[in-house]
């Protein structure tokens, strides 16, 4: 949904400068790797860092009939930060889920492809756009934000979580 939230530039600056972003290590292939992005988790909507996000939670909950009760945010510092192909297991444990993602900041490619193989599709959401992965998207598709070394700007993704749809760690 293009231009879903107004004041995207101000919200981006507020989140970039006030959220306690963290780096995490991940064990894969018997090695430990630093995740190429930073994250912040708000398990309770009462704790979200900006009132506009609370308004977004309420609007999305009303619109989709899903109680969104937390946020998972990613900060991609530049084009070297990325996330590989994955499904959102933690926020979608049911067959049909609705996972909205608000994009803020620099435009980055967002790719999806069928889990059983096939060509990927590329989207380039702008700051303030809402990407909604609904239905069986988390069962039948994988998605990623690939590295783009030429990108210098920062991107934030705000993932709206629902404990009714998934189990949080």
Regions found by a protein language model. Name each.
Residues 1-169:
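Non-heme Fe(II) oxygenase metal-center motifs and adjacent flexible, charged/small-residue loops
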């Amino acid at each position: 949904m293009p231009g879903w939230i107004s004041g995207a530039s101000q919200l981006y600056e507020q989140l970039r400068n006030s959220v306690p972003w963290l780096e995490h290590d991940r064990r894969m292939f018997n090695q430990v790797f630093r995740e190429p992005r930073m994250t912040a988790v708000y398990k309770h909507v009462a704790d979200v860092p900006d009132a506009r996000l609370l308004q977004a939670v309420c609007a999305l909950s009303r619109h989709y009939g899903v109680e969104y009760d937390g946020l998972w945010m990613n900060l991609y510092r530049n084009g070297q930060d990325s996330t590989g192909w994955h499904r959102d297991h933690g926020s979608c444990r049911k067959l049909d889920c609705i996972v909205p993602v608000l994009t803020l900041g620099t435009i980055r490619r967002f790719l999806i492809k069928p889990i059983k193989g096939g060509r990927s599709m590329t989207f380039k959401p702008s700051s303030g756009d809402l990407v909604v992965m609904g239905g069986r998207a988390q069962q039948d598709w994988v998605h990623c934000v690939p590295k783009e070394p030429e990108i210098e700007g920062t991107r934030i993704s705000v993932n709206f979580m629902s404990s009714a749809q998934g189990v949080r760690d």
